[in-house]
Amino acid sequence: MKWQRVKYQPNTPLGANGQKVTASKAHTELSKQAAKEGMVLLKNENSLLPFEKGTRLAVFGKASADYVKGGGGSGDVTVSYTVSLDAGLKALSDYVSVYEGLSSFYNKNVRDQYERGVAPGMTVEPEVPAELLKKARAYTDTALITICRFSGEGWDRTSSYDNGVESGEPMWKESQKVFERGDFYLSDAEQRMVEPVKATFPKVVVVLNVGGVVDSMWFAEDPKIQSVLMAWQGGIEGGAAAAELLCGIGSPSGKLADTFAKTLEDYPSSYNFHESQDYVDYTDDIYVGYRYFETIPGADKKVVYPFGYGLSYTTFKWELERVDEAEDGTLTVRVEVTNTGNHEGKEVLQLYGSAPKGVLDKPSKILLSYAKTKLLQPGENQLVTLVGNVNDLASYDDLGVLHKSAYVMEQGEYHFYLGNSVRNTEELGFIHTEESTRVAEQLTECLAPTSLPKRMRADGSFEELPVRPSHDPDSEGLLTKKEKETIDGVAPDVRFSKGEHLWNNNERRMQFEQVAEGSVTLDEFVAQLSDEELAHLLGGQPNTGVANTFGFGNLPECGIPNFMTADGPAGLRILPECGVCTTAWPCATLLACTWNPEIVYEVGAAGAKEVRENNIAVWLTPAINIHRTPMCGRNFEYYSEDPYLVAKQAGAMVRGIQSQHIAATVKHFALNNKETNRKDSNSRVSERAARQIYLKTFERIVKEAKPWCIMSSYNIVNDYRASENHDLLEKLLRDEWGFEGVVMTDWWTFGEHCKEVNAGNDVKMAAGNPDNLLKALEKGLLKRETMECSVKRLLGVLLKID
């Protein structure tokens, strides 16, 4: 019987021999494998890593015990354990030994802080007694410094540019107490730990347990620090994964998904990020991440570690076999990669393209494709194929300089580069030539800015933008002032249905299972529903089982079960009081750094099995907003600064999830790049930047991975709330990109329900306002056909779930 699991909550184990898959050994091992695949070796002078067998280690830093598996909020996961770096190293006693004096000191200190209510990752770095430092040096000549960071949903990372603007979140205020200049930089206490270690030990390794970009200048050019492993936030087995790589059980193969600059102010977005709670001006326009650092004059000197960078314990060479271009612009590049070193390893080949300088400003390079090799033994080779498209080098003309509202391929030569980072590339002999400027894709204007005063150009200067009259996002919009007052006067209806019949007629109702069986069409089924039932279905439904993020459907008189939703981006999130522990997967930034869609697909499929096993139907992941600035508190939950890399990695997550008949939910649509005042902050952006950077991730995923659900964001986009934005939800998402699934709001938005439905938002979460919809329907401000359309989209997704 279809939906038996959802209807009767049997918690049927999905593993072999009646075993549960949730937090199973197979899943925690996969989590560790994925973590190892995305950790990035930033520095390794004199091949200090991997440690030789028998190496003695003095491990410094509270992060050795205060392990941060992931970020806070929807990205947090209830687990039965986490493996710290200290525990991970001790488990490898055949490879290394850890000085117990330091281990006991840090474990006790962290445990004491936890007992005082300090959150993981927010503990204070303790002062190391001089005598303990002396004993550690007597034990070994090799030190390992650990640093960790924690951030979360609802609050942004602190910086010296806060200008007194507070997020109001307790964790934000706690962070300010710990980090004097913001958590991008080392705290004073961390510096007091690092300096004596460098002065005392001839061999020093650093491990970073962080969720986003941090200062790297303190170790990058310091000869006293020989090796650095960016271990990110590695999930439930993250400490074990890092320990294994340090000991040579595997070779680091991660590549950076973001550019590491010298200082925070080197990121153009940092100056105005904390300027106001009310708005964010995207004045950097299309020059985000490496597009800025590789294009703007002088910006290249600000880079410490470039996009795509990452070392290995071995070396590789590659030879170009051939390049082919199809009529539709598809490029196929074949490369032979050989492991030329003495250690096994994987390499990532990256294909970049460059458009000619023309009338429209352009970045100097953009990523077109990439491919990761299999695990290559010394001397082994592999033929690798990269597939991209020259039309991805087109520029969107939002001002009509060449051709209004169109992607344009300007006249001239297009060059291509192959390498293992955006900096370390070789130009291919192949050149694509446009004899004359042509329109690659004609579109229509969407999301024109109303308040953005200027935007950056390729030479680093700024141009003024024509803007439309500003718009109050809470103005009457579709309603007159009087009508708005009437509807706004209705209190939100959060009295969820408990199964009472909304239908007063005694005749037999068509059942939803008949639609699934094919004996009744979806049109026929929806046509029988009353206005009240339609309004009921367009809102979230009460929690059942272990869920805490509410559900969809729940119309028992017509056989529609209550389909539960659940967070989140780092694993199935179930509240601790429910007593169910799940697998914490590595954070999204780490998954992006794997540059390996196949392993992300495996993580998605495994996570979806845990979702199914716990009677959840809709998984609220992946989150795919762009890393515009290191300061966004939710960057750990997002993937990268590059829209192509995000789309390919997160798209694999979507495909993996939906292979298990669980609905993936791509979020937050769109331009949700700041957590402070996220429900009322206006993202002011040009149409070109929106299309080429911030919406391109969603567009590619919609077209290639075909997600069943999308979540609109809290924020305002160019003066219109995202959840009420017809340009976003209808013109772009459905009319241009062909999205056929359901759009839900983020939880408890400030948007008005009838305006959201009219804009294309199908379900208001966590609860709807049926009275608002019915009054709008009565006044002619909302059509029944519009409600039916949203309900059909919702039920269409529920039909796919099993």
Regions found by a protein language model. Give the residues of each.
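Glycoside hydrolase catalytic-domain context in secreted enzymes
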Residues: 1-424, 443-802
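Short beta-strand elements
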Residues: 424-444
